[in-house]
Swiss-Prot record:
Active-site positions on this chain: C73, C183
Protein residues bound to substrate: D10, S11, Y42, G43, N74, T75, T184, H185
Catalytic activity, reaction form: L-glutamate = D-glutamate
Protein's pathway: Cell wall biogenesis; peptidoglycan biosynthesis
Family: Belongs to the aspartate/glutamate racemases family.
GO biological process, one term: regulation of cell shape
GO molecular function: glutamate racemase activity
Keyword ATP-binding: no
Taxonomic source organism: Lactococcus lactis subsp. lactis (strain IL1403)
Name of the featured protein: Glutamate racemase
Amino acid sequence: MDNRPIGLLDSGVGGLTVARELLRQLPNEEIVYIGDTRRAPYGPRSREQIIAFTWDMVNFLLSKDVKMIVMACNTATAMALEIVKEKLDIPVIGVILPGASSAIQKTKTNKIGVIATQASIRSDEYHKTIARKSSAVEVYSLACPKFVSIVESNEMESEIARKVVSESLVPLIGKVDTLILGCTHYPLLRSLIQETMGKEVRLIDSGAEAVRDISVLLNYFSINGQERQPLEHRFYTTAGVNSFREIAEKWLNIGQLQIEHTEIENFNKEK
């Protein structure tokens, strides 16, 4: 047993979709969450910037004595997961492999779509991961850079969101039977995405799929949390505490959240 918290990192509020599923599936686990909202979105950034920003978040979480780090951000996973895993002696998990594996299991036509940030699409990590597991699958990748901004500005239910989603997804309509939401912000637009793609298309939430792997790792390393009350979940953001709180409280549907502003730039530097 290990009652230390699990650390989650994201470029903003998107990783809350992973946090929600983690809290639902693993009720004995405390979490520490860092959202780098000030420097979001990560999608247009260079690989070097994304790696540096990810290290800032990793080192911040290490300062909170976490027992595991979840890269609840597809862009960070694509660019920095293997680099970080090599340097740390605690488990580190990303969201790409779980999402890809689930999509392969669910597709009936072997035609899978991936929507993600520009950086994730450029990295081609989803395509490469799927190809390693199944040579029969065709992958259709599409960058949807406007989606993150809509979520970060809390406009998920606006007419602007509906218009942007419907126009952005046109290249994939009718081509795939399974669609990976390859950015943890995107499940916050799930209803609009489903409406646009059609009810017959299966949507894969990569973050939610990752929680199943988190549970496996907790058991494997014997670091599960004990049943206890109360649990102290802590959330940190580098900008916009009020908007972060509004989205977090609505999405997580739990009482008073402990949310603080923090600075992480060049935090403790890379080891």
